[in-house]
Amino acid sequence: MRLYINEIKIKDDILYCYTEDSIKGLSEVGQMLVDSDNYAFAYTLDDGKAYAYLIFVQETWTMLHENTTKKIIINDELELTEFHQELTYILDNIKGNNNYGKEFVATVEETFDIE
């Protein structure tokens, strides 16, 4: 199941991210995947039976980049404690790696100020 983050707010030094779908019963796996065809990052969640993916599309990337030290909470209930570490790992892997596609890599490098 793909759960799209469609709203992000900052309050009290916390990044609140919202999806229209329920996240009840889901917990974080601590793994970030890349959907380079759709210019998105997918953060893996699990309900004990199947995986779900929080989708952070390109329009959310600037907020993620500008708020790397803030806690991330989904739908006011689930804190993603490993999100920033996983995002950093993925960004390090994407840097200069055209296996993701040159245009995708260039967009990520520009958005996240990767040199």
UniProtKB/Swiss-Prot annotation:
Domain of life where this protein originates: Bacteria
One matching Pfam family: UPF0738
Family recorded in the similarity comment: Belongs to the UPF0738 family.
Name of the protein described by the UniProt record: UPF0738 protein SaurJH9_1003
Originating species: Staphylococcus aureus (strain JH9)
